[in-house]
């Protein structure tokens, strides 16, 4: 495994691979690796000859009142986990990524202004900045992201399309704890009791899916589910939408997604479930 701290190091490495006609799969992370990240590496190995993982806690996607300083960092443990699993790890500092400071604005479009983009308006602009920069440096053939951050996935796909980048964007399924809680680096903030409470998010989303498949009215379902969520969390949003557009479900909808974001204390949790729409859906 080649460990790269500077842009020039990873650039020289990927140039050599491209000259050898090797394909490159890329997984951007902020570290704090868990089984969800490792599942993306498994996908990457199937999609390309070489696998690169980046570890960079991106300050551009944190608001001033968020957890940039306290975000879980475990670089040594992450590198041990990656040692036998990837070909290179890119660990840049802020000056490598933003040599002229964080100033670029990228229009993330409608998809980036709803749901998480509505309550965290800074997030997708900061996220898309760093992803575009990393794509320019690593020049992958394919990049893999987790389904848990589903809205982020769609924003990235839209960016790749808008910029005509020759990069295939793949996604990996949500990996869950035995309780159903979606794995996340921020789960480290949860106490044992909080983790049990957090599992209610997936339970409620699963219930909504079951009822949607029974053709129950979505407006009624949402009110019931929101009431249930508020028994355990501070609710940010709960939506049942077309999975491809994040708009209201229509006759042309093929897949439905149920998305929610909640707060448990100061910890923000997101989750979603995607499923095929029944032919007789009303």
UniProtKB/Swiss-Prot annotation:
Name of the top EC class for this enzyme: ligase
Catalysed reactions, semicolon-separated: (R)-pantoate + beta-alanine + ATP = (R)-pantothenate + AMP + diphosphate + H(+)
Keyword presence, Flavoprotein: no
GO molecular function, one term: ATP binding
Listed GO CC annotations: cytosol
Enzyme active site: 37
Residue positions binding (R)-pantoate: 61, 152
InterPro entries tied to this protein: Cyt_trans-like, Pantoate_ligase, Pantoate_ligase_C, Rossmann-like_a/b/a_fold
EC number in record: 6.3.2.1
Disulfide topology: none
Residues the entry annotates as binding ATP: 30-37, 146-149, 175, 183-186
Xref: SUPFAM superfamilies: Nucleotidylyl transferase
Keywords: ATP-binding, Cytoplasm, Ligase, Nucleotide-binding, Pantothenate biosynthesis
Pathway linked to the protein: Cofactor biosynthesis; (R)-pantothenate biosynthesis; (R)-pantothenate from (R)-pantoate and beta-alanine: step 1/1
GO BP terms in the entry: pantothenate biosynthetic process
Location of the protein in the cell: Cytoplasm
Chain residues that bind beta-alanine: 61
Miscellaneous notes: The reaction proceeds by a bi uni uni bi ping pong mechanism.
Function: Catalyzes the condensation of pantoate with beta-alanine in an ATP-dependent reaction via a pantoyl-adenylate intermediate.
UniProt family annotation: Belongs to the pantothenate synthetase family.
Subunit structure: Homodimer.
Protein name: Pantothenate synthetase
Organism: Vesicomyosocius okutanii subsp. Calyptogena okutanii (strain HA)
């Amino acid at each position: 495994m080649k460990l790269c701290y500077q842009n020039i190091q990873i650039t020289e490495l990927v140039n050599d691979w491209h000259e050898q006609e090797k394909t490159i799969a890329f997984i951007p992370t902020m570290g704090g690796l868990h089984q969800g990240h490792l599942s993306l590496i498994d996908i990457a190995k199937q999609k390309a000859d070489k696998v690169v993982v980046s570890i960079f806690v991106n300050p551009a996607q944190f608001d001033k009142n968020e957890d940039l300083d306290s975000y879980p960092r475990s670089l040594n443990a992450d590198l041990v986990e990656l040692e036998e699993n990837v070909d290179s790890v890119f660990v840049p500092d802020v000056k490598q990524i933003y040599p002229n400071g964080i100033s670029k604005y990228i229009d993330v479009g409608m998809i980036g202004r709803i749901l998480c983009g509505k309550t965290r308006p800074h997030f997708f602009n900061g996220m898309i900045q760093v992803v575009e920069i990393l794509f320019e440096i690593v020049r992958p053939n394919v990049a893999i992201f987790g389904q848990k951050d589903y809205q982020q996935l769609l924003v990235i796909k839209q960016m790749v399309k808008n910029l005509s980048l020759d990069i295939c964007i793949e996604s990996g399924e949500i990996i869950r704890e035995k309780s159903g809680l979606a794995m996340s680096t921020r789960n480290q903030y949860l106490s044992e009791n909080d983790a049990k409470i957090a599992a209610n998010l997936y339970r409620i989303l699963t219930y909504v899916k079951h009822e949607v498949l029974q053709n129950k009215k979505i407006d009624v379902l949402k009110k019931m589910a929101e009431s249930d969520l508020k028994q355990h969390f501070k609710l940010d949003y709960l939506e049942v939408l077309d999975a491809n557009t994040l708009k209201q479900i229509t006759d042309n909808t093929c897949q439905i997604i149920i998305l929610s974001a909640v707060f448990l204390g100061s910890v923000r949790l997101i989750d979603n479930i995607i499923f095929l729409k029944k032919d007789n859906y009303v």
